[in-house]
Amino acid sequence: MLTNDRTVGKIRVSVIEKAVAAGRSTMEKINTRDEILKVALDLFSVNGYEATSISQIADAVGIRKASLYSHFSSKQEILDNVVAAVLTGYDNHSIFANTNWDDPEFTKDKQGMTAEDAAGMIQSQVRRILHDPAISKGRKMLMIEQFRNKELADLQTRVNYEDIIRYFEGMIRFLVRMNKLKESDTEIMAAQLSSPITVWINLCDREPSREEEVMELVHKHVLQFFEIYAK
């Protein structure tokens, strides 16, 4: 009986060890997959998709090219997963994607919004755009690829134009309702408010040392906008 108990015990230990090994292998595979996507985004944001090879990605990760294909079947699949990850992060964290200025729950603490409040809120989002690695690299990748890839061009239009205009239009309509701003063409007002900020963000991409200068420009620009359209 003792022998049988020992045998059963050994079998149980063996099963547990195999399960642990399998779990470790799965985690390692997931970690490698995530690292491939991270490295691919790094390379795509600098060199572009076309100029980046599978070999370059594998070398940067520290694996063989053949090993990379056990995680992704092609460079296109890597790109698809990179874009999906960037878009998920954007949808989850960007105020431009998530904010609804017609939602009373969102606006209930913004009834007394001042020009300074708006400037601070916008400056905070600009810093996030500049310093969140996924957002920053994703933007740069889209800028490079928008002329080669229709899907990415459409995504670029959405995240760097449509969502931004929609956000600022919503904010302006809200401020008009609160009698903070006078009524005018809200789409044009949104473009007037957001377009210089977009230009300054692009300037920071090229010349990071000018960030504080840009922050001051954003602050003065928002205050002047409120001054011009004040009711």
Locations of regions flagged by a protein language model:
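Hydrophobic/aromatic residues within well-ordered alpha-helical segments
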Residues: 75, 82, 86, 90, ...
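Helix-turn-helix
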Residues: 35, 39, 43-85
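N-terminal intrinsically disordered/low-complexity leader segments
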Residues: 1-31, 101
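A short secondary-structure junction motif
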Residues: 89-93, 97, 149, 167, ...
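Hydrophobic alpha-helical connector segments
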Residues: 81, 94-133, 189-190
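C-terminal alpha-helix
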Residues: 221-231
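Amphipathic alpha-helical packing segments from all-alpha helical-bundle domains
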Residues: 130-143, 147-177
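Hydrophobic/aromatic-rich alpha-helical bundle segments in the mid-to-C-terminal region
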Residues: 154, 158, 162, 172-223
